[in-house]
Amino acid sequence: MDFGDDLELVGAEITVKEINYVSELTGLTFPDDTEPVGYYFLGSGIDRSLVLKVMIQGDQREEFLKNEIFEKGNDAKSNHHIAKQQEWWKVNELTERIDRKFELPKLKYVECTVGLEEGKTFVYVTWFEI
């Protein structure tokens, strides 16, 4: 996505292309059978930002938690304003929640929250630059 483009996708509209783009920006590795829920890329602002919600299989949770952000990131809850504007963003309803924030090069940041929602494992990601 380039500066000036905003893109919102829900469920099946989200393809491997968007998941791979999030991986490229954040360094997060997602399981092959990740089920997308919501994706929003804000490119029209001064600083780009992105939010993503996916579901992963419960037996893949421990493997997902091996991503660098969970080993080296700070324990911090995400409160990015564009995330809160998405109807599918229900991070405050999670149980067994793990929150991390990690600074990337060039004043970019990634936040990731993993937890249970109605007994299923969901991953919430925010990425932004300042």
Spans of features found by a protein language model:
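Extracytoplasmic electrostatic interaction patches
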Residues: 68-130
